Amino acid sequence: MNVRLSNETIKVEAKSLGFFACGVAQANRVDDVTACKYRDWLSSSGHASMAYLSENIDKRLDPRLLFEGAKSIICVALNYTPQKKTPLKGEFAIASYALGQDYHDIIKSKLHRLAANLGIDNYKACCDTAPILERYWAVRAGLGWIGKNHQLIIPHAGSMFFLAELIVDFETDYDKPIVCRCGNCHACIDNCPTGALKSPDDNPDIPFDSSLC
């Protein structure tokens, strides 16, 4: 692509398609600390039964290996907060994100429309299934910060949203990360129904227990 798109142009178009948050990060290998933590997490079986998270590690740690010519990563978020709470049936309830149409299809369609509307013809659309550290790039793109719930928190939106990315082959103006605003709050830990989250006195770098989540 020869035409340089501005950061603001990208955001306006993304929000017109229903993405309530959008930011852009430069495509590089993830920092060494993150890469080391991810490998250690896998080594300690932190991913539980999610074996796919141990696949394509090189691509997960460097999006330039996932998409040749990658220069920028456009990160977007789509809200999935339900209009009403799902009633419990016995001990179980359907997770809110699983209600309705398959979100992969909906978001992929929106990503392709975003690319088309912006005149981008060389890109890779990612939504959940691609080997990319979505939360890491969302932080780099200034969407939010990683909270004590180990999820991305977007200001005024919490953590109930889907993340998706367009990896593109052009540079633009990049957003800056947001400083964590959790402070002394640990409401997520107190309200975790399965105990998957660590207590606030524990090492914050220890991931939550995926097998309990």
Language model features by range: what are they?
Residues M1-R181:
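Auxiliary alpha/beta "docking" domains used to position bulky ligands
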Residues A187-L212:
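Iron-sulfur cluster-binding cysteine motifs and their immediate structural context
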